[in-house]
Amino acid sequence: MKASTLALCCLLVGVQSSCAPARTATTPAPSSASASAEQEILNLSRQKWRWMSQRNVDSLAALFDEKSVFVHMGATFSKSQELEVIRSGGIVYKSVDVLDESVRFVGSTAILLTRLRLVAVVGGNEVTNPFVVTEVFVPQGGKWTLASLSFTRLLTP
């Protein structure tokens, strides 16, 4: 009886092992080129937030692609509309508390997801919102340009 129980246990362990998903190699560390590009995107995004809070529309205009789009809660803007909203104080970015960032590359396009808490003045009212912000950067003429910026408000703080 003991021998048959032991054999059954060994058989079950063998079946379980053969049904388990095959182990894959660990994800290789990013190459220095992609790590460098990732850091460049992170730095550029952080600089963009500073320019937005300083209302530095000249620097933002150089960063924003001509065909860029900006998606806010309740509004979608073109490059010129976004710059005007910032210039006029329609939205004043007071502070950005970055909680988490991740960069992904699809071909030569960089997608940055940033979880943050934003304090802004919108229409004269100060608001604080938790967001995930999606930024899409594309290489143009040897530099990165911002093609899209989208705010998604989180339900949890």
What positions do the PLM features span?
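Bacterial N-terminal signal peptides that target proteins for export
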Residues: M1-A7
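Intrinsic disorder/low-complexity segments
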Residues: M1, G14-V15, P28-S31
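Bacterial N-terminal signal peptides
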Residues: A7-Q16
